[in-house]
Amino acid sequence: MENTKKIGNLTELQCMTYLYGLGYSISIPFGNADKYDLILDINDKLYKIQIKHSSEYRDELGEAEYVKFKCTWQSHNTSGYTRTQYQENEIDYFATFYNGKCYLVPVNECANEKILRIKPPKNNQRKGISFLEDYIAEEVISKL
Protein backbone atom coordinates (compact mmCIF):
# COMPACT_ATOMS: atom_id res chain seq x y z
CA MET A 1 0.00 0.00 0.00
CA GLU A 2 1.27 3.44 -0.88
CA ASN A 3 -0.13 5.52 1.96
CA THR A 4 -2.20 5.50 5.12
CA LYS A 5 -5.29 6.84 3.34
CA LYS A 6 -5.35 3.83 1.00
CA ILE A 7 -4.75 1.46 3.91
CA GLY A 8 -7.65 3.06 5.80
CA ASN A 9 -9.91 2.87 2.75
CA LEU A 10 -9.13 -0.82 2.32
CA THR A 11 -9.98 -1.48 5.99
CA GLU A 12 -13.28 0.37 5.52
CA LEU A 13 -14.15 -1.74 2.47
CA GLN A 14 -13.23 -4.96 4.27
CA CYS A 15 -15.39 -4.13 7.31
CA MET A 16 -18.31 -2.98 5.16
CA THR A 17 -18.16 -6.11 3.00
CA TYR A 18 -17.98 -8.34 6.07
CA LEU A 19 -20.92 -6.68 7.85
CA TYR A 20 -22.99 -6.55 4.67
CA GLY A 21 -22.20 -10.23 4.12
CA LEU A 22 -23.75 -10.94 7.53
CA GLY A 23 -26.99 -9.50 6.16
CA TYR A 24 -26.99 -6.05 7.76
CA SER A 25 -27.93 -2.82 6.03
CA ILE A 26 -25.16 -0.24 5.83
CA SER A 27 -25.38 3.49 5.13
CA ILE A 28 -22.39 5.66 4.36
CA PRO A 29 -22.43 9.38 5.22
CA PHE A 30 -21.85 11.85 2.39
CA GLY A 31 -18.49 13.65 2.51
CA ASN A 32 -15.93 13.26 5.26
CA ALA A 33 -17.13 15.71 7.93
CA ASP A 34 -18.72 13.07 10.19
CA LYS A 35 -16.92 11.29 13.01
CA TYR A 36 -18.27 7.93 11.83
CA ASP A 37 -17.59 5.97 8.65
CA LEU A 38 -20.84 4.06 8.43
CA ILE A 39 -24.23 3.53 9.99
CA LEU A 40 -25.07 -0.08 10.76
CA ASP A 41 -28.77 -0.97 10.93
CA ILE A 42 -29.37 -3.84 13.35
CA ASN A 43 -33.01 -4.73 14.05
CA ASP A 44 -34.14 -1.19 13.15
CA LYS A 45 -31.63 0.41 15.52
CA LEU A 46 -28.84 2.52 14.01
CA TYR A 47 -25.24 2.37 15.24
CA LYS A 48 -22.49 4.83 14.30
CA ILE A 49 -19.29 2.97 13.43
CA GLN A 50 -15.79 4.45 13.10
CA ILE A 51 -13.47 2.08 11.20
CA LYS A 52 -9.79 1.95 12.12
CA HIS A 53 -6.89 0.05 10.59
CA SER A 54 -5.18 -2.16 13.16
CA SER A 55 -1.51 -3.12 13.22
CA GLU A 56 -0.35 -6.60 14.17
CA TYR A 57 2.43 -7.02 16.72
CA ARG A 58 4.47 -10.21 17.00
CA ASP A 59 6.39 -11.77 19.87
CA GLU A 60 10.08 -12.74 19.78
CA LEU A 61 9.16 -16.05 18.08
CA GLY A 62 7.37 -14.20 15.30
CA GLU A 63 3.89 -15.28 16.41
CA ALA A 64 1.00 -12.82 16.34
CA GLU A 65 0.56 -11.50 19.88
CA TYR A 66 -1.90 -8.61 19.60
CA VAL A 67 -3.40 -5.99 17.30
CA LYS A 68 -3.62 -2.31 18.11
CA PHE A 69 -5.48 0.68 16.68
CA LYS A 70 -5.75 4.37 17.52
CA CYS A 71 -9.00 5.57 19.10
CA THR A 72 -8.42 9.19 18.19
CA TRP A 73 -8.91 11.48 15.23
CA GLN A 74 -6.42 13.98 13.91
CA SER A 75 -7.19 17.54 12.94
CA HIS A 76 -5.07 20.40 11.71
CA ASN A 77 -5.23 24.04 12.70
CA THR A 78 -2.84 27.00 12.72
CA SER A 79 -1.01 25.51 15.71
CA GLY A 80 -0.38 22.21 13.95
CA TYR A 81 -1.89 18.75 14.31
CA THR A 82 -3.91 17.63 17.31
CA ARG A 83 -5.32 14.23 18.28
CA THR A 84 -8.72 14.04 19.96
CA GLN A 85 -10.49 11.06 21.51
CA TYR A 86 -13.86 9.99 20.14
CA GLN A 87 -16.75 10.47 22.55
CA GLU A 88 -19.77 8.25 23.23
CA ASN A 89 -22.12 10.87 21.75
CA GLU A 90 -20.13 10.80 18.46
CA ILE A 91 -19.83 7.08 17.73
CA ASP A 92 -21.05 3.79 19.18
CA TYR A 93 -18.36 1.35 18.04
CA PHE A 94 -14.94 1.11 16.51
CA ALA A 95 -14.57 -1.53 13.82
CA THR A 96 -11.34 -3.10 12.63
CA PHE A 97 -10.50 -5.95 10.30
CA TYR A 98 -7.95 -8.65 11.02
CA ASN A 99 -7.28 -12.09 9.58
CA GLY A 100 -10.53 -12.26 7.60
CA LYS A 101 -12.91 -11.02 10.32
CA CYS A 102 -14.44 -7.76 11.44
CA TYR A 103 -14.28 -6.81 15.11
CA LEU A 104 -16.51 -4.30 16.94
CA VAL A 105 -15.30 -2.52 20.08
CA PRO A 106 -17.61 -0.20 22.09
CA VAL A 107 -16.27 3.36 22.17
CA ASN A 108 -16.59 3.42 25.98
CA GLU A 109 -13.90 0.71 26.19
CA CYS A 110 -11.32 2.82 24.38
CA ALA A 111 -9.01 5.66 25.34
CA ASN A 112 -6.15 6.79 23.06
CA GLU A 113 -5.58 3.33 21.62
CA LYS A 114 -6.99 -0.17 21.95
CA ILE A 115 -4.97 -3.35 22.24
CA LEU A 116 -6.73 -6.63 21.47
CA ARG A 117 -4.70 -9.65 22.48
CA ILE A 118 -4.53 -12.67 20.23
CA LYS A 119 -2.79 -14.79 22.84
CA PRO A 120 -2.56 -14.34 26.62
CA PRO A 121 0.29 -12.34 28.13
CA LYS A 122 3.25 -14.34 29.42
CA ASN A 123 2.15 -13.75 33.03
CA ASN A 124 -1.35 -15.08 32.13
CA GLN A 125 -2.98 -11.91 33.45
CA ARG A 126 -6.66 -11.71 32.51
CA LYS A 127 -7.90 -8.68 34.46
CA GLY A 128 -7.95 -5.54 32.35
CA ILE A 129 -6.96 -7.45 29.20
CA SER A 130 -9.09 -7.32 26.05
CA PHE A 131 -8.97 -10.41 23.85
CA LEU A 132 -9.60 -10.18 20.12
CA GLU A 133 -11.94 -13.19 20.14
CA ASP A 134 -14.36 -11.34 22.45
CA TYR A 135 -15.03 -8.66 19.82
CA ILE A 136 -15.92 -10.71 16.73
CA ALA A 137 -18.68 -8.72 15.02
CA GLU A 138 -21.23 -11.55 15.03
CA GLU A 139 -20.77 -12.11 18.76
CA VAL A 140 -21.03 -8.43 19.65
CA ILE A 141 -24.11 -7.96 17.44
CA SER A 142 -25.83 -11.03 18.93
CA LYS A 143 -25.74 -9.31 22.35
CA LEU A 144 -27.42 -6.10 21.16
Regions found by a protein language model. Give the residues of each.
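A short secondary-structure junction signal
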Residues: 105-108
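N-terminal targeting/anchoring "stem" of glycan-biosynthesis enzymes
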Residues: 18-20, 98, 117
